[in-house]
Amino acid sequence: MDESRARALRNDLTTFASRWWAGEAEVTRTFFSQKRSKDEHLRWLRMQAFKELQPRPNGIIIRLISELRDDYNRLEHGVDRHDFLHKIQFLEEEFRHYQLFADVVDYLTGEKITPEELAQYEVPEEVRLRELRSSLMKEHGDLARFASSFCEGGGASLYYEGMQVGGDALHDMIATACRGVYEDEIEHAEQGASGLEQGHWTEEQWALA
């Protein structure tokens, strides 16, 4: 497949996904267009903090820490230093996202949120999404990994809309948190899109993506 065809298919995929990203943006705008109670904010903020930390045995933070520990013992002996650094940077990003939203939770409650408290905010839809991504990656490998990265964070719609709020201390903190995540998610999406565009995929694989 030539470069121009791959770029056209990437654009088609973006157009296809955009309808759902627009829907997420509309939901977020609607939420912030009305005055919300402390409990309403705490619910979504705790769910978001959970999503970033994933406080469970196979959660992304603890998994990356474990992988880095194992990889360090093989550094330059099967583990490339650039790949090792990339994993460190990814760990920093994910934990920083948690820190940003957890700080807003602490501001509202006046107490420190703990991983144990956050564990109760895992919703069934998140579990199903995680299981779906895992099964697709096992079946389709890099194709599913790039497609998942491309769509990561719902096109960053929530974070983009959240960046626009402000006017008081709470909403300023929310905007700061969303801005910090937005910039990273856009980069992840670009990496996924580039991986798809530069891969040697067939028309059928693009349709599957």
Where are these regions (language model features)?
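Non-heme di-metal
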Residues: 1-209
